[in-house]
């Protein structure tokens, strides 16, 4: 497909369908920019030019103060995905938002993403969430990293995601003994 400059894209876009574009933003400002963008689209009555604005995030479990906490992480920090009809007016609306540094592509040619690329991003987000959903699984081998059983290897018998705790069976004097540990007291064996 031949490269088009921004003028060609803008002049032909009235008849084009909406396409996905990637906007580069200031780091950490993605949600604020999305909010401002939605306000400006509404205020300027341009909702016909825009379909969707995505800041791809996934949930991850982190252990903080011995508690399992769900935290949102950005899949693509400093980037926003936007499905829009690229016209001169819509291009300027996006480009003039404070914190937007530009569209992905060259200065004169914003690069449109394919639907399959967008689908891959959505699948990657889902995969990261599914992977995180089970930090530890029953039957998994772990090593105790702190406490009186440090360096002992055992098998996970129970997992309590809410309390961030495990019941691990370790061998003490040749006898399998269950001990309760926090997620921070063990590490997975590779």
UniProtKB/Swiss-Prot annotation:
**Where in this chain does the record put each KOW domain?**
138-166
Cited Pfam families: KOW, NusG
Known Gene3D superfamilies for this protein?
2.30.30.30, NusG, N-terminal domain (3.30.70.940)
Task: Give Gene Ontology CC terms.
Answer: cytosol
Gene Ontology biological-process entries: DNA-templated transcription termination; regulation of DNA-templated transcription elongation; transcription antitermination; transcription elongation-coupled chromatin remodeling
Top-level division of the source organism's lineage: Bacteria
Q: Which InterPro entries match?
A: KOW, NGN, NGN-like_dom, NGN_dom_sf, NusG-like, Rib_uL2_dom2, Transcrpt_antiterm_NusG, Transcrpt_antiterm_NusG_bac_CS
Task: Give the transmembrane region(s).
Answer: none
**Alphabetical UniProt keywords:** Transcription, Transcription antitermination, Transcription regulation, Transcription termination
Instruction: Tell me its family.
Output: Belongs to the NusG family.
Protein purpose:
Participates in transcription elongation, termination and antitermination.
What's the protein here called? Transcription termination/antitermination protein NusG
Q: What's the source species for this entry?
A: Rickettsia bellii (strain RML369-C)
